[in-house]
Amino acid sequence: MEATSATVAVSLGVLLIGAPIAATGGETPKNGGILNYVIPADAPPSFDAHRETTFATIHSAAPFYSVLIRVDPNNPSSTTDFVCDLCTAIPQPAYGGTTYTFKIRSGVKFHDGSPLTAADVAASWEHIVHPPEGVLSPRELHYVMVDTIDAPDPTTVVFHLKFATSAFLPALADPYSWIYKKATLDHDPRWYEKNILGSGPFKFVEYQVGQWIKGAKNPDYYDKGLPHLAGFTGIYADKQAVRVDAIRADRAAIEFRGFPPSVRDELVSALGDKIAVQTSDWNCGSFIEPNHKKKPFDDARVRRALTLAIDRWHGTAALAKIANVRTVGSVIFPGDPLAPSNEQLHEVAGFWSDIEKSRTEAKRLLKEAGAENLTFELLNRDVDQPYKYVGIWITDEWSKIGVKVTQKILPSGPWVAAERAGDFAVVLQANCHSVVNPLIDVQPYLSSSISKQNYGNYEDPKQQEIFDKALHETDPAQQKQLMFQFAKHVMDIEAHKLVLPWWYRIVPYRSYVKGWKISSSHYLNQDLANIWLDK
C-alpha cells in the first residue's frame, strides 16, 4: 500500500527504551487503547529498513514488519539471548558451524492477505546480503561469512556460511532485516522505500510527512494474543523541547531514543509517580577520528599524545551529570563477554590510572614529533546530546597538554558530507549499533578500503590480520584474547581512533505504559507488540 494512504483501521502503539525495569509482577495485560509516542526526527529518509541506518525508519515502521529472529523482548538487555519471530526454533548449526536451517511458521500472512513463505524470507535476506546493482545495503559487510541462502521448500530457509563464526547469529537478529514480499522485490527492489507492506503486529493506516504515522492492530497476527494495543501514533518532533512538553502534557507517553539527565529530573520533579524511568548502557560510543591524510595526524605519536591527554576515569563521572554518557570502555560494548576488564583497560594508552604520568608522556610525544604548539579544528555535529557536551570536554582536556583546539560545528547533513569528503583534520563521531555483536560492531575501525564507515583514511594490514583471526576463531577464550589485541592496536599502538565514554540511555515515560523492557539500543524491541496501557 502507498505509505501516504489510509487503507486500514487506525490504531496506536509505542515502544519505549530505557533502563532495566522489573517484570510486570503478575499484572494481567489490558487490551485496547492507542499509544502516542514521539519520534525525534522530522521524517524518515525512507521506509525501507534494508537501505537505511537511522532510528527514524525503525521507530516509524518496525511495528508493521516481522523478522526471522530477534532479541528476546522479555530479556532485551541480554547480549546473547535470541528468539524466533518468523521461525519456529533457533537451529543448531551443522557441518562444523557452517549451515543453519530454519523452519518457518505456517499460516503467516502479509497484510494484503497473501501467504508469507520461506521464499519471501530467503529473498529478503538475499536482498540484504547480496544486493542487486543499484540497491543500497549498508550492512552488507556484516554478512561476509554468508555464502548462499536457499529456500528448498515453503517452510525451510537454509543459510550456508563460508566459515563458522560466532558473529553470524547476532547479525541475523539485526532489527533492520524486515521480511518483504518476494514478488514485490522481484518487480521493483526499491518499492519499499515509499510503501509499506509487512506481516507484523500492526497494519499501516496513515502517514503525514513531518506530522505522524499511524498503525492499527493486525487481527490476523500469527502470535496469538498480541498485540495488546488497538493501535499507535508516532508523532514526529525534531525539537527536544517539543517532545518533553508532549510527555509532560500527556500528548505522548514516551520517546524511545532517550533524554539527557536534566530532562529526566525535570519530568520526575513535575509529575512524580506518573513518570517511570528506565536506563541502560547504550550500544553507542563517541570517538575522535584523526584524518591520517592531514599532517601531523599521519604520525602515530601525535595521535597517541591526544588520547593520553584525556582523563576518562574522572572526566566521565563529571560529564555524566549533564550528558547522556556514563561508561568508560574500549571498542567493545561494556559488559559483553568479549569486553576487556578495567584492569586490562589500564594497560591501554589513555586509560592509565595516573593522569599526570599520562599527560607527561603526551607532551614528550608531541615534542618528539615536532608538534609542541599543535593547533587544529575539531569538526563536530550540531546536536547537543552528547556531541556538543563531549566536544567542550575534550577540547578542555587537550588544552592541559598545550594543544589549542577550536570547534567547527555543522548541521548533520554538512557534517556527514565533510566526513565523507575528508574535509576535516579531526572529527568527533559516534559508533552506534543495534544488537551487541563486537565482531561486527568494530568494523568502522577497519581500514578505509574495507569499511565505508571509516573516515580516518588509513590502511592497516596488521589490524586486519588480527580481526580476521578473531572473526574465524570459535573458542571464546581465544577470541576474547584476540579482541583485546585488536582493541589495544586500534586505541594504543596506532591510536587510529580515540575511544571516549559509551553513551547511557535514559528514558522517562508515562507510568501507565507497561510491558516494555529496555535494551542496549534504541533500534531494538520496537514492534510494540508486548506493550499495554494500564488506564
Predicted stretch roles:
Residues 38-95, 126, 195-198:
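N-terminal lobe/hinge region of extracytoplasmic solute-binding protein
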Residues 36, 117-124, 154-160, 200-201, ...:
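Alpha-helical secondary-structure segments
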Residues 69-77, 173-227, 231, 241, ...:
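Gly/Pro-rich hinge or "lid" segments in bacterial periplasmic/extracellular proteins
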